Amino acid sequence: MNDTQEQRRVAVITGASSGIGAATARALAADGYRVALLARRVDRITALADELGNAAIAIEADVTDRDALLAAADRVQQERGGADVLINNAGVMLLGPFSSDQREDYRRMIEVNLLGAITTTEVFLDQLKSGGGDVVNISSVAGRTARSGNGVYAATKWGLNGWSESLRQELLPDVRVTVIEPGAVATELPGHITHEETKQYAAQAYSQVTVTAEDIAEVIAFAVNRPRHLAIHEVLLRPAGQATP
């Protein structure tokens, strides 16, 4: 590794195998970042790392597994000198009416969307503090408003927003905390819904109006590239034609 490579910022991205995570990896790599791609689907992040070249490393990790995250953090420290930016992007959106039939979905959303971001940040925090870092938490428009059928998903995003504000106050000015709240984005998330009627409704809604993952990634890159005296704390993004929350 040459001196120029050593000076480039390092961004760790969870959920990097697709959607906003993969798009953000491409955007930050284009801006000169060395990216560490974390996800469960190792084949996808390996292919993405190959696409991006030697600026990227692929690390198999599940954000619900603290031991896996500790191993990932150790590898980032050893191979890249530590993280400067953490993008907490891993998430699931398992919408549906509230019932005991959905109880596993509820647990999964809480473990991934909320506890996953908290644990990943806890594990990487010392690295981020060492040189002036950024934490970017990918929330949702559902973190501002709830609607029928998205109650637990919204709860995880409201929780993420509340924790992010507390974290921002604790870590300033050395580590900036940014919350990104996308509306409808063309990603895999709606396809993972297990409640069939809700899945069909979401597919129809998403077929009418979305933005791309690249649109969101561009905003993330803008936020982390601001001068250190400026912090962008919260960004709400919707397709221009999205009327519903």
Pin down the residues of each PLM region:
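Substrate-binding pocket helix/loop in short-chain dehydrogenase/reductase
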Residues: 97-98, 102-107
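The beta1-alpha1 cofactor-binding region of Rossmann-like NAD(H)/NADP(H)-dependent oxidoreductases
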Residues: 61-71, 103
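Conserved glycine-rich Rossmann-like NAD(P)H-binding loop of the short-chain dehydrogenase/reductase
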Residues: 31-48
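Active-site helix of classical SDR
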Residues: 121, 156
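C-terminal helical subdomain
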Residues: 179-180, 199-245
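Residue(s) in the substrate-gating loop at a strand-loop-helix junction
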Residues: 140
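Conserved glycine-rich cofactor-binding loop
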Residues: 17-18
